[in-house]
Amino acid sequence: MNWDETRRALRDWTGGQPRAEHLAAQILAAEGFNDIDPVHPFGGRDGGADAFATLEGKPWIMAAYFTREPRELSAIEKKFKGDLDGVDKNGASGIAFVTNQVISRGERETLKVHASGKARIFHLERVATVLDRPEMKSIREKYLGITDPADDIRQVLADHLEKQSSGGESSEPEGEATNTDVSVVEALIVDPLEQIGKVQEAERAH
């Protein structure tokens, strides 16, 4: 996994609105929001919110804004102000605005002024940072298709050991290390991007 893979997957979003809303809900859950209740991620009247939630016991609304290409601040601001109407409409204490857009600190402050400070803005960098936490690994895989090379390595090694235990891979005496065993161990200590290939190459050569 490259260091900016999560960021790039978010920036070049192709998942559509339903997936964006579900991913946004996961971000809120990771950031201390509770009672998250999506409204109509697959279409329909949403009552001015993509989801309802609570933060510190107070009602909040969520709005997800994911696009395939970057938007100018004017477009982001227009969307934010439109979603902001849902705060008063639903008697909420604030809005959690989750987006894949790059929004600078100064721009975020400008948006918060419209909300009288009652906003949490989860912009591209913040969302990527949350998703890159170790505990968010399954969420990255589910919504962004990002897998951990280590998982693939473990699977290849598990398959290799299973073949050995069934007697289908080695004709050498029990207790002696085979050439494949040595190659597997060596593969586990090199760069992660090379590990899978080395293990598979060792098995083919055996």
Describe the role of every protein-language-model region:
Residues 1-206:
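Mixed-charge (Asp/Glu-Lys/Arg
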